[in-house]
Design a protein with these regions (language model features):
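Low-complexity or membrane-interfacial segments used for flexible interactions
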Residues: 7-88, 94-97, 106, 110-112, ...
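Short, strongly hydrophobic alpha-helical membrane anchors
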Residues: 1-5
């Protein structure tokens, strides 16, 4: 009797896992350094101005992230304070100049993160972004829109004129969190990197809190 009641549950779980995997495949736009642009990106948006990459072990507690170019040169480095209530993160460029700072709001139900980019852009991101039924999220302070699969960080970033700024894709079936950032507007490079680093840290925090 017990096994009989468990079978429908197991079948439903399998269907859900397959469905999530299928959706991830649909949205995935990852390509490795040295490979050509994802064919869907190329058809929809053309050749990106440049591509950047991040990599981190899937279940690592290490928060530092290197952002590399097509030749595996480190162009940005993200470092976080391990013992900080606000999970303060600093992003620096290859010359060790600060390009952005990220800070988590204390006592927030929505895990709000404040991002300050050198040059004047300031905005916030929250875990509301990861609601499973939403495929679109607007960063009000910038007027930018993220559209896609946020749970796996496969999304397109548009500006307030609906022009593509960047396309972010995660590599599936990997022991590392690997992301590709195809940049179509290099003037917004630092802001895009800050968004991706913030979302990576938020996803890592969600995994650790649920484990």
């Amino acid at each position: 009797m017990y096994m009989g009641t468990m079978q429908p549950v197991l079948i439903l779980m399998v269907i859900m896992v397959v469905g999530i995997f299928a959706v991830s495949l649909i949205f995935q736009r990852y390509h490795s350094a040295g490979e050509g642009t994802d064919i869907r990106n190329y058809k929809e948006y053309g050749e990106p101005a440049k591509s950047l990459y991040t990599s981190r072990y899937l279940f690592s507690f290490h928060k530092d992230i290197d952002v590399t170019d097509e030749n595996d040169n480190v162009v940005y480095h993200s470092s976080s304070k391990l013992f900080s209530f606000t999970n303060e993160t600093t992003i620096t460029d290859v010359e060790d100049r600060v390009v952005a700072r990220i800070e988590k709001k204390l006592f927030s139900l929505h895990s709000i993160h404040y991002i300050d980019v050198v040059g004047g852009k300031s905005f916030e991101l929250s875990k509301e972004l990861f609601r499973i039924l939403d495929m679109k999220f607007t960063i009000d302070e910038l007027g930018w829109t993220l559209q896609g699969d946020f749970a796996n960080l496969n999304f397109v970033l548009y500006n307030n004129q609906e022009r593509v700024i960047a396309v972010v894709g995660q590599k599936l079936l990997s022991m590392r969190d690997k992301y590709c950032i195809d940049l179509y507007d290099v003037n917004e490079e630092a802001t895009v990197v800050a968004i991706v680093v913030t979302l990576e840290n938020m996803l890592m925090a969600r995994r650790h809190s649920s484990s």
